[in-house]
Amino acid sequence: MKKSTKNLLWLLLLIVLTVCTVLVITSCSKGFSFKGFMHLISNASPVWMLFAAICAFGFVFFEGMGLKCTCNFLGEPITTGKAILYSATDIYFSALTPSAAGGQPAALLMMMNHGVSAAVSAIALLLNLVMYTVSIMLISTVCFIVYPDMLFRLDTGALIFIIIGAVVQVLFIVLFVMCIFNEKLVLAVCRFCLKLLCRMKIFHNYDEHYEKLLGIIKQYKQCGILLRHKTVLLLKVFFHNLMQRLSVIMVAVCVFIGVGGAPSKAFEAFSAQTFAVLGSNAAPVPGAVGIVDYIFLNGFEHLVADPVSVELLSRGLSFYCNLIFCGILMFVNFIRMKPKTGLEHND
């Protein structure tokens, strides 16, 4: 009951942030009008909009395929349908919570309810998270090397978000590697930080959080050992997570071309969206609402006449439609599982 209330509050916060963000960006843009937005949608290429929708689904699909690869490799195979369901659960709750990994506990619980062991579930989710992080850093690096001008076009605020987002991703990778090779050092640093947070009254129960910390470090170490000896699995999961990142980035590119953007500037649009995704890790905001929008508009204002309309359409497909789709999948699964649960209780 407590978790349900907390999730409901996060959902309400997401809705409030979304409404506020839309109101701010539409009211502050001199070139935006609702009539113009509807005109843009009605004149958009159906083919490119279809491609954008397929790419949006790819964000859910490829994460699921990454989970399926790991589970199958570790001897606990899952179907494609269940893999997509676990992915949808992870994405849905990650969008509601401030953390990009906020959906993992919910996905872990669902996987365990379907018979996947806790160890395999945890490793599959963690491996996906690591490869997901490596993927965006790789894509961002390529964009910076190939088209550095995009970064230099952005204003100071957008650059700060992107730099913080990159630092957060690098720190996560460093922490993961250190857990593999120097577990004692990581534990000492984390213990110091935890004590400091407790003294600052940010955390209240040291022992409870310390136990969680030990569990996380143990999972990281198990996953790291797996990575060192299972190169084929590593490459497969990396590929699927790379495709997941590319899918969500390509939504913006397809929308850009679909509404009349010059195909010759497609990589510029790709770079702008890539940096928006990277910057989304800068602050603990549900769905990175406001941050992604700000960086997107900053990058696309040099590419299209009406960046707000393009942003609303692109973000609507890549984030909000995906959120609704994932929510529907979980609701359908809940309805299907409820009769079975009832029968089990009757038995």
Predicted segment positions?
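Transmembrane helix-loop-helix hairpins in multi-pass inner-membrane proteins
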Residues: 1-39, 93-203, 285, 289-347
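Membrane-interface helix starts
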Residues: 8-9, 43-52, 225-239
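A short amphipathic helical element positioned immediately N-terminal to and/or at the very start
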Residues: 35-43, 216-228
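Alpha-helical transmembrane segments of multi-pass integral membrane proteins
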Residues: 52-59, 90-97, 132, 240-244, ...
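Membrane-embedded helical hairpins/re-entrant loop segments and their flanking transmembrane helices
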Residues: 64-88, 255-272, 296
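Extended non-transmembrane interhelical loops and adjacent amphipathic helices
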Residues: 72, 84-115, 207-221
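Alpha-helical transmembrane segments of multi-pass membrane proteins
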Residues: 81-90, 267-278, 306-316
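Transmembrane helical segments that form the transport core of multi-pass membrane transport proteins
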Residues: 224-278
